[in-house]
Amino acid sequence: MFRWGIIFLVIALIAAALGFGGLAGTAAGAAKIVFVVGIILFLLSLFTGRKRP
């Protein structure tokens, strides 16, 4: 999940540097969503992790 977030962030930075404003905004939004979902899944797995039998 975090890898996808970083990939979208890099795409957004490259698009912003080249002047593609719409594409940069879309990629940055996707990066934020993927990052937040990754954090939520991490916290869920942390709290509901492997329990002793």
From Swiss-Prot:
Keyword hit for Ribosomal protein: no
Keywords carried by this UniProt record: Cell membrane, Membrane, Transmembrane, Transmembrane helix
Subcellular location, record wording: Cell membrane
Keyword Cytoplasm: no
Membrane topology: Multi-pass membrane protein
Disulfide bonds, paired cysteine numbers: none
Transmembrane segments: 4-24, 30-47
GO cellular component: plasma membrane
Pfam families the record matches: DUF1328 (PF07043)
InterPro entries the record matches: DUF1328 (IPR009760)
Principal cellular location given in the protein's record: membrane
Protein family according to the UniProt entry: Belongs to the UPF0391 family.
Name the record gives this protein: UPF0391 membrane protein PC1_0455
Source species of the chain: Pectobacterium carotovorum subsp. carotovorum (strain PC1)
